[in-house]
Amino acid sequence: MTDTPQLDAQMAFLNEACKLKQVDRQSALQDLSRPENSAEHSWHVALYALVMDIPELSDPADRSKAIKMILLHDLVEIDAGDHPIHLDHDADAVAQAEAAAATRLFGLLPADQAAEMRTLWDEFEAGSTAAARGAKRMDHVQPMLQAAAPAVPLPDHVQVVEDNLAQGRARNLHIDWPEMFAHVRAALDTTPAPTGDVAKRIAFLNECDRLKPVYRATYISGGSRFENSAEHSWHLALYALVLAEHAPHPINVDRVITMLLLHDLVEIDAGDHPIFGDYDASAKEAEELEAARRIFGLLPDAQGAEMLAIWQEFEANETPDAVFAKSLDRFQAPNQNLASNGGSWAKYNVTYDTFREKVGGKIGYGAPILLDWVTPRVKAFLDAMPR
């Protein structure tokens, strides 16, 4: 059994991180069907940092660092909760609670990674570097566009945005990012927005919000509800950040994270297809390619082509980056099933042999160490599962 303290600690952190999916925010999905949670919010903000073009993120290294900060920035809400900007809070008390949460959560990791992740989180909080300022800008802009996007926005949410623009943390948006200010203002005023690349990126990001109501067969840890594909994508990007050392071949972790942020966007059109379910693989492949072309086609031409190429690389499963990303995609679900009293395994009457046939080989192809770690845990559970 692969049972190293390093991997045990990493998985303890990743399983604990799943709790962020249960932290609801004041903001709502753009279809107004339910509150947005902090995990899918983090995924959406990471997409903002991936596609938006601002001076702070002009250096690819700063963009990559900003995305990592965004993946981590709200984890403290697992312990400290979300604090809506329009409500009064004791800022010192919140800062202390969040710092204590960061100490506990990152402390679950091996010491070297704990220090690395805590440094990223502290840098984001301080907002003193280009990467941190860029990450914070995305974190500030996403909720405003989120509130203004519905056909009939919620009046109280609109008022929060108006107050934010007038005297809150976005009060200098008209100076710092005038083009984005013009788009937010147009959305609030229901007047024609400026055209151009920013408009196309906003259209893409608004479309991405539709992944949040796409639910998977897998439960979140604890089994209280099904996981949606947006929060799943955030969790996988976090898996990549934490588990990159276990790739059997050299990888570019930033590209792996990008693949995992993008990989399930096609489910907006094509839906989720459970690995233990029955479906026509050829029809699924064609439907997903059509979806990818439509969704990435919302972006400016060159950027859309780049994102489509990354998605196609992931699907082809041939490069070291794609192979590791695919293996992580298969590795996450068994861990959540183990943390959910079997989760989807009971529904599909999964046996250990079924797991080996449908999942095990796919994990082992790109992450044999992870397969060695999870296999005895899965076998023990499935062999004992009532049928």
Regions found by a protein language model. Give the residues of each.
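Alpha-helical, largely C-terminal catalytic domains
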Residues: 1-387
